[in-house]
Amino acid sequence: MALVEGNNGVSGGAVSFSEEQEALVLKSWAIMKKDSANIGLRFFLKIFEVAPSASQMFSFLRNSDVPLEKNPKLKTHAMSVFVMTCEAAAQLRKAGKVTVRDTTLKRLGATHFKYGVGDAHFEVTRFALLETIKEAVPVDMWSPAMKSAWSEAYNQLVAAIKQEMKPAE
C-alpha cells in the first residue's frame, strides 16, 4: 500500500498533535479496528440520519431501493472511509502530517470538489464521527480529552482535503 502524504494547512506542514492526543486516538482505534466494517456503516448511517439529503451525493445510493443498512456498496465505502480516517488520525503525530493509504489527497480533494462537498457537510461528518466513536468505545473510555483528540485529527484531515479541493487534472 502506498502511503501518500500531504500538507495539512498548518504553516510549515508540521502538525500539532500531542502525545496524549495520540495515545487516546490509538487506544480507541485499537478497540474499534476489530469491528470497523460495522462501525463504519453506523458512521455513515448517522451522517444520513443527521443530513438525509447527503445520501444523494453518492451515485450508488441514488435511485436505489436497497435499504441503506443493507446496501453492499455503502458498506464497502463506509468501511474504507472510516478506516482511512482512523488510520490517518493514528499516524498524525508520528508522521507530522496527514497521511492517507491507497489514495491520494489530490484525488480525495477532486472527488469532494466534484460532488460539491462544503463546510456544512464536513461539520455533519465530524459530528457523526465523534458520536459513532463515543458509542463504539467503552463508556468509561470516552472523555472530553478523547473527543478533542479525535476532533483535532479530523480537522487536520479535512484541512488537507480542502487544500486539494479543485477540479481533477
Swiss-Prot record:
Keyword set, alphabetical order: Cytoplasm, Heme, Iron, Metal-binding, Nucleus, Oxidoreductase, Stress response
Range of residues in the leader sequence: none
GO molecular function, one term: metal ion binding
Residues that bind heme b: 59, 73, 77, 107, 111-112
A GO CC term attached to the entry: nucleus
PROSITE patterns associated with the record: GLOBIN, PLANT_GLOBIN
Cofactor binding remark: Binds 1 heme group per subunit.
Site for Homodimerization, residues: 147
Position of sequence motif Homodimerization: 49-53, 119-131
Gene Ontology process terms (BP): cellular response to potassium ion starvation; response to nitrate; response to nitric oxide; response to nitrite
Localisation: Cytoplasm; Nucleus
Domain Globin: 16-166
EC number: 1.7.2.-
Cofactor field: heme b
Tissue distribution: Expressed in leaves, but not in roots. Present in embryonic organs including embryos, coleoptiles and seminal roots.
Pfam families according to UniProt: Globin
Enzyme's top EC category: oxidoreductase
Induction statement: By flooding and etiolating but not by oxidative, nitrosative or hormonal stresses. Strong, rapid and transient induction by nitrate NO(3)(-), nitrite NO(2)(-) and nitric oxide (NO) donors, such as S-nitroso-N-acetylpenicillamine (SNAP) and sodium nitroprusside (SNP).
SUPFAM superfamilies (alphabetical): Globin-like (SSF46458)
Family: Belongs to the plant globin family.
Oligomeric and partner information: Homodimer.
Protein purpose: Phytoglobin that reduces nitrite to nitric oxide under anoxic conditions (e.g. during flooding or in waterlogged soil). May not function as an oxygen storage or transport protein. Has an unusually high affinity for O(2) through an hexacoordinate heme iron because of a very low dissociation constant. Promotes tolerance to low potassium K(+) conditions.
Protein name, UniProt field: Anaerobic nitrite reductase NSHB2
Taxonomic classification: Eukaryota, Viridiplantae, Streptophyta, Embryophyta, Tracheophyta
Gene name per UniProt: NSHB2
